[in-house]
Amino acid sequence: MTNLQDQTQQIVPFIRSLLMPTTGPASIPDDTLEKHTLRSETSTYNLTVGDTGSGLIVFFPGFPGSIVGAHYTLQSNGNYKFDQMLLTAQNLPASYNYCRLVSRSLTVRSSTLPGGVYALNGTINAVTFQGSLSELTDVSYNGLMSATANINDKIGNVLVGEGVTVLSLPTSYDLGYVRLGDPIPAIGLDPKMVATCDSSDRPRVYTITAADNYQFSSQYQTGGVTITLFSANIDAITSLSVGGELVFKTSVQSLVLGATICLIGFDGTAVITRAVAANNGLTAGIDNLMPFNLVIPTNEITQPITSIKLEIVTSKSDGQAGEQMSWSASGSLAVTIHGGNYPGALRPVTLVAYERVATGSVVTVAGVSNFELIPNPELAKNLVTEYGRFDPGAMNYTKLILSERDRLGIKTVWPTREYTDFREYFMEVADLNSPLKIAGAFGFKDIIRAIRRIAVPVVSTLFPPAAPVAHAIGEGVDYLRGDEAQAASGTARAASGKARAASGRIRQLTLAADKGYEVVANLFQVPQNPVVDGILASPGILRGAHNLDCVLREGATLFPVVITTVEDAMTPKALNNKMFAVIEGVREDLQPPSQRGSFIRTLSGHRVYGYAPDGVLPLETGRDYTVVPIDDVWDDSIMLSKDPIPPIVGNSGNLAIAYMDVFRPKVPIHVAMTGALNACGEIEKISFRSTKLATAHRLGLKLAGPGAFDVNTGPNWATFIKRFPHNPRDWDRLPYLNLPYLPPNAGRQYHLAMAASEFKETPELESAVRAMEAAANVDPLFQSALSVFMWLEENGIVTDMANFALSDPNAHRMRNFLANALQAGSKSQRAKYGTAGYGVEARGPTLEGAQREKDTRISKKMETMGIYFATQEWVAFNRHRRPSPGQLKYWQNTREIPDPNEYYLDYVHAEKSRLASEEQILRAATSIYGAPVQAEPLQAFIDEVAKVYEINHGRGPNQEQMKDLLLTAMEMKHRNPRRAPPKPKPKPNAPTQRPPGRLGRWIRTVSDEDLE
């Protein structure tokens, strides 16, 4: 697929660089092969936030050159003001002549705070607009979000500290190199003279009808009267030219005109002003011509241009105030933007607006741009350049991935943290051998695997040197270089194998259905949707793939062939196998050059192109057909092959042509056909059956061919027709039955061709096979050995088992494996799958089967208990339950079979109630109501407790009832006037009085009375 030799990791460098530009540049794998050098250029700017805290950054993500974008600040009057252009670090035109942009990513965020600010405020809105800058109608912070409806092209309210990342995705492919406007050698008298070579590829041209008999009338003023004759939106960031003419007519003498062209920037200011006419006198009565021929070089365009206007100044020689001035004008002009229509040059644009950021903060813009560059002659002396690598597989893989980018979650604008988290996912996308674990977590696994299935085969088909045809060189056959192998008739051909297969014991494959397929009467397997590695994909999963040039959406029938060369009359030598399609009409333009010009006539005189001219095709067809090689089939399309395949012959193609002629399907039929007819018109088996089966299986198809077993089609063919809506509704029989040259029992001899060893038709081999068949009929052990061999061959593990046998000569490991493997009926197998015997796939029971087993089990148990009315049918009607107590009592009392789902509650004895004593109720009420020191419970509370005992048939309250009683008691205590008085709260301890001082043992204290 890629140019790497490492088989464990197949990276597509181009898509990796697109999704992760910081990983470096990669050559674009298209067929534009120029010697170039790869270079990564960085862009880093620290932008200061203005007074309003808002601004706008305009990016040109696809521009092939040094220009990256521009920065504008929002003024207090609501208008934007241009700040500066954003460029790459190196001025590319100074060193390089031509350029192609490979990838680009830019990050906008802020992490700095001005003095006095302690919080990082502000948010960012970003949107990618699929148009030019001048086409935006609302560039306000909130209005930007209405520029597109694609959710993957806009994000809003991202914190300025987190930042956003802008990713450049290609808007077109297979593009040429663009001239950079580099300086060219020149000599002039003026030292400031500059000569450059600008891009002339894909210019953008604006045609403006400036005036169509426009009438001007005014009175003379000093300095003249100025009017804007026209103003039109244009887009330019590179050099441009203006050309055209105006014709003026007047009846006033001595009128003088001046004309000025102004190029207006995005902020509304005039970037460039050029006078194209000054003091041009008009002659009355005649046509006065005013031509325009203006060239603006790139170095003068200092900011993006979004409009152009033409101003006319009217005056009069020696005029007096109040004198009348009038004229009429007609004419048009054209504005040519050099390289402006190159994809990515002016559209799309990505706008990143920030709001409410602290004044003086710094918004950092950092990014990388990857280029393919062709150096100028001076630099080329010291810089090695090399050709790009043509890799159509990588290119188509990239196209298919990006065509589904909305469904794969690939955005153009990201929150920076989310983009960083997605890098591992992008690595999975770029690595063809990755297991897609992260993609599976996001739900993208099926889509990417389907794209890989389509894109990978393109390498070997469109670019054979990338993956040569298997065994072609090793076998010494060099038909890829033009030395085609010569068949017996002198013409190289692909033979489908007419010989009878040697083995008559090819049995039908037991596991006939792959995951994602519908099996129809064991006859055909028709995918209703694309199948990729056994995973069913949804219809239309690869809409973008239909845009490839090699994809054909027409009715077709498919058949495989084996490309052979003939060494002698008896020994064909197989080289390769290929799938072919039969399409209606003469379509040699779809064939590879090696097949064109070769055709065979049918019995009715029509032609089949792509067949070797070997006699007459034994068919009567109603029209011409073309046989083309194909590489893949999915949905309702086929992918054509450009391999140098020679013209073909063979019965498989005859069957496919007959099928196409009779039924004319409108879409490719998803079943490959093969078969052979003997001289008597009877169906024979075919050789190369396993090779053809492998060919069909690679495309997710099954091979329908002749076999030794009858297949009863019955009404199932009509079911198949209904499942395939493109077919006519009157197809109620197997199509093979309607082929004009097949025997009546042909349909019953067709089934899915199974894998078999590839035998050569030799007498010795046929006798050996017959001997093996005879031995198998009489020796059961030999029969088992043949069955094991068939099982190994059908599943494609013969070589693996042979290698395993070499490493285990005494079969010790195999015996241990078989001894520990799950056996039919073992406990571990029953626990996981249910019961199953050998040769039968163990599956868990269905819901109906499990219910039937339960009914049988209940019925047998009831029978052992003497309850004979509970039969299996009765249990099923009883909702798969055993008889209830009421049903059993009814049967015991009446000896009549009770009705299912009737419970007979009258026959069930009511529960006996126990009456609680008054003492028990009072004791419980007192315990619940409060402590013994409190007042006795109220009679109302005692009655509540008695009700609980009555409800519980004499038992005490449960937990819920106890909670309710406690709440009731609390309420009654608060409103009870006879409740016990609350205990007085203890007073705080007062400090004791200080005793009087001790005066002596016999001295009495003098009191107040003594003093009186």
Swiss-Prot record:
It is an enzyme of class 3 (hydrolase). Its EC number is 3.4.21.-. Residues 1003-1012 are annotated as: Interaction with VP1 protein. Residues 513-755 form the Peptidase S50 domain. One of its GO terms (biological process) is proteolysis. A divalent metal cation binds at residue 30. The record marks 441-442, 487-488, 494-495, 501-502, 512-513, 755-756 as: Cleavage. Keywords: Capsid protein, Host cytoplasm, Hydrolase, Metal-binding, Protease, Serine protease, T=13 icosahedral capsid protein, Virion. GO terms for cellular component: host cell cytoplasm; T=13 icosahedral viral capsid. The active site is at 652 (nucleophile), 692. It holds the Pfam family Birna_VP4. Residues 970-1012 are annotated as: Disordered. Gene3D superfamilies: 2.60.120.20, 6.10.250.1030, Birnavirus VP3 protein, domain 2, Capsid protein VP3, domain 1, icosahedral virus. Residues 975-986 have a biased composition (Basic residues). One of its GO terms (molecular function) is serine-type peptidase activity. Specific enzymatic cleavages yield mature proteins. The capsid assembly seems to be regulated by polyprotein processing. The protease VP4 cleaves itself off the polyprotein, thus releasing pre-VP2 and VP3 within the infected cell. During capsid assembly, the C-terminus of pre-VP2 is further processed by VP4, giving rise to VP2, the external capsid protein and three small peptides that all stay closely associated with the capsid. Capsid protein VP2 self assembles to form an icosahedral capsid with a T=13 symmetry, about 70 nm in diameter, and consisting of 260 VP2 trimers. The capsid encapsulates the genomic dsRNA. VP2 is also involved in attachment and entry into the host cell by interacting with host ITGA4/ITGB1. This is Structural polyprotein.
